[in-house]
Amino acid sequence: MAKLSKRLQAFAAKVDRQKLYAIDEALSLVKECASAKFDESIDVAVQLGIDAKKSDQVVRGSVVLPAGTGKSVRVAVFAQGEKAEQARAAGAEVVGMEDLAEQVKAGKLDFDIVIASPDTMRVVGTLGQILGPRGLMPNPKVGTVTPDVATAVKNAKAGQVQFRVDKAGIIHATIGRASFEPTALRSNLNALVDALQKAKPATSKGVYLRKVALSSTMGVGVRVDQASIAAQ
């Protein structure tokens, strides 16, 4: 831990916490800090100008990152008949109905995302106490309850990320890995910001995107000049 602490202290000394860095410089700094022995994730935190306590200002959605996430995703799908076959053909690892529900109840949750056809919600709805706390409960707002299960599976495999504002009004998301080229990370960040703009609540007043900061898994935060994101 001592070496890690010294490394972070040395990096933190390079970062001006009050400065807004242009996106290219911010990405360079964050990638420089990502010197752990594993491929660190590159994460973004976006402070939104909303009141998260108001139900009509909860920002939630999903976006397919053009350069992917760098993570392989296991997908489970609740579907039957033709839709079940379509889900399997699209690459879903687990497809079922009552049998899949029993697997979930038994604690066998070896998947990262759950997708459901609308006609299966009578079964899926009974699993809320298990799937909900794990962030796995299908929801139409993020595209995981849909009649087009094949496209949903393909999106999940292609690098779709879900986002939801927390109680402090902040969106947290991963936009790639330290091994990604800066151009890939930049395009992913642009896609996320575009999705957040489209999800802006009608009742949100004033500045909507207030602060943007980047960091690696083991690194420190680097604030980003939003104008440099818009300029890409």
Curated annotation (Swiss-Prot):
Example GO CC term: the record gives:
cytosolic large ribosomal subunit
Q: Which GO terms describe its biological process?
A: regulation of translation; translation
Q: Which SUPFAM superfamilies match?
A: Ribosomal protein L1
Query: Which superkingdom does the taxonomy of this entry point to?
Result: Bacteria
Q: Name one GO molecular function term.
A: structural constituent of ribosome
Q: Which InterPro entries match?
A: Ribosom_uL1_bac-type, Ribosomal_uL1, Ribosomal_uL1-like, Ribosomal_uL1/biogenesis, Ribosomal_uL1_3-a/b-sand, Ribosomal_uL1_CS
**Keywords in UniProt for this one?**
Repressor, Ribonucleoprotein, Ribosomal protein, RNA-binding, rRNA-binding, Translation regulation, tRNA-binding
Q: What does this protein do?
A: Binds directly to 23S rRNA. The L1 stalk is quite mobile in the ribosome, and is involved in E site tRNA release.
Which family, according to UniProt? Belongs to the universal ribosomal protein uL1 family.
Q: How does it assemble?
A: Part of the 50S ribosomal subunit.
Q: What is this protein called?
A: Large ribosomal subunit protein uL1
